[in-house]
């Protein structure tokens, strides 16, 4: 009887082990993405605490981004094959996670991001954001969308992790993100091999780069001086959009009649033009002018393309 009970228990134990193994294999076969993409990251108790670092994910400037989704890079020849491969893996991870940002190799002269592997690879310009050893080096600080024009990454002090932790950390800085006070985050000031690219970072990048690049023309100011039947006027036009405004036309209107039009040509993003006209013939009864901007380039908002200016009498 004792032998029979022992055999029954042995059979039950074998069945439990068999089912357990089958269940584990089932999970591995059918849920590989979930096991990899949503792995739990344990806090790193050995990382030093930080001060004056926000608990919230933020950009150096609100809405800071490149004005294009196909971002180019150049890896300096001084970088080893391992350093190049780890950087390429970092680009691939961000590209796969966002599903919208792509990275392509380019010449050193034309690249959006320069990657070096020594402290002397590239000198940082003045008044730029270099967080750690990577970040934007040229920013056009427009009101609506501050634009990253250039970025740099230095990889001379890599952490020996299986994943490209250092490369991802610096790349996220180049994309405009500040440090965050979360030891589990790839953007924490101190690195550990267990850190991950946060879903909040990915969602912010998706939201920013899903916005179609457009121009954004508006009048900074305008003035008009009338003497008799003539007017001298000056207008200051800005483009705060993500792309250049092509074939910009300034129309001058009074009492629903177009008095004249002027070709302002192209206005680059983050740039502006001051345009002045002397001795424009106007009806004597006219006491104001309406200025209207038109362009063939799509804009975020056309409501601010019209401005009315009352005359200053001489």
Locate the predicted segments by residue.
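Disordered inhibitory propeptide/activation segment of secreted metzincin zinc metalloprotease zymogens
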Residues: 4-83, 91, 134-144
């Amino acid at each position: 009887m004792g032998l029979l009970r022992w055999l029954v228990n042995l059979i039950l134990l074998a069945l439990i082990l068999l089912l357990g193994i089958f269940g584990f294999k089932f999970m591995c076969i059918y849920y590989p993405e979930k096991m990899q993409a949503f792995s739990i990251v344990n806090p790193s108790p050995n990382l030093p605490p930080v001060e004056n670092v926000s608990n919230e994910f933020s950009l150096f400037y609100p809405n800071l981004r490149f004005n294009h989704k196909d971002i180019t890079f150049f890896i300096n020849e001084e970088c080893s094959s391992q350093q190049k491969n780890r950087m390429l893996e970092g680009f691939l991870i961000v590209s796969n996670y966002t599903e919208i940002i792509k990275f392509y190799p380019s010449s050193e002269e034309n690249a959006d991001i320069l990657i070096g592997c020594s402290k002397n690879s590239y000198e940082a310009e003045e008044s730029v954001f270099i967080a750690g050893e990577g970040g934007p080096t040229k920013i056009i600080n427009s009101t609506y969308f501050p634009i990253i024009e250039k970025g740099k990454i230095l990889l001379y002090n890599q952490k020996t992790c299986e994943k490209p932790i250092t490369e991802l950390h610096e790349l996220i800085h180049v994309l405009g993100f500040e440090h965050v006070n979360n030891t589990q985050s790839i953007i924490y000031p101190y690195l550990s091999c267990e850190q991950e690219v946060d879903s909040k970072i990915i969602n912010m990048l998706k939201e920013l780069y899903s916005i179609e690049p457009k121009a954004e023309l508006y009048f900074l100011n305008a003035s008009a001086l009338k003497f008799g039947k003539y007017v001298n006027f000056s207008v200051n036009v800005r483009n705060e959009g993500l792309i250049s405004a092509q074939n910009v036309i300034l129309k001058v209107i009074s009492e629903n009649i177009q008095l004249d039009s002027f070709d302002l040509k192209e206005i680059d993003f983050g740039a502006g033009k001051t345009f002045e006209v002397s001795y424009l013939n106007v009806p004597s009864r006219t006491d104001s002018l309406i200025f209207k901007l038109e362009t063939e380039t799509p804009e975020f908002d056309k409501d601010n393309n019209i401005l009315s200016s009352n005359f200053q009498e001489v």
